[in-house]
Amino acid sequence: MDNLNKCLRVAGFLDNSLVNGEGLRSVLFVSGCRHKCPGCHNASMQAFDYGDSVSLKEILGRIEKNVPLIKGVTFSGGDPFEHADVLSELAEEIKDMGLNIWCYSGYTYEEIMDSNDESKISLLSKVDVLVDGRFDASKKEGAPKYAGSSNQRILKLS
């Protein structure tokens, strides 16, 4: 990575979780989301100034402490694709550690691909599983495991 000193606005971090993707994993919650889904589970994280500015070096150090116990890392938030440029660099380092990446986004796979945004497409190329689509509180019942509502998809990308 060119610059481990780059910072990301972090809303929270879980060293280990079993509910944010398959297997034991660390979870990085980023700040900032434009979707503003009614009933959002992480509504406080929608503000782009929520949380703390944390360097990628610090985030990687925290993840490394959890290896070899964890299987992967999950990006959640907020919406990780609001920070695709920085997260793409972080994802590259995580993949080099032999970990898989799950990512939750209110954007659909198609919206990301159609955006022609190089940083978003770059991040997507490093994601193993994308849970996509805006949360819909009226569709909570019948949601697939690891999704918040039934309209969301779990896409295995690699």
What kind of region is each of these model predictions?
Residues S17, I63-E64, E118-K120, P144:
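Short, flexible, glycine/charge-rich loop motifs used to bind or transfer phosphoryl groups or to couple energy/partner
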Residues D2-K6, S17, R25, F29, ...:
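Class I S-adenosyl-L-methionine
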Residues N42-V54, P68-H83, M97-S115, L124-S138, ...:
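Core AdoMet radical
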Residues H35:
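Glycine-centered loop/turn positions within well-structured domains
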Residues M1-F29, P38, N42-F48:
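N-terminal [4Fe-4S]-dependent radical SAM core
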Residues E58-G61, D85-D96, E118, S122:
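Alpha-helical scaffolding segments of alpha/beta enzyme cores, especially the outer helices
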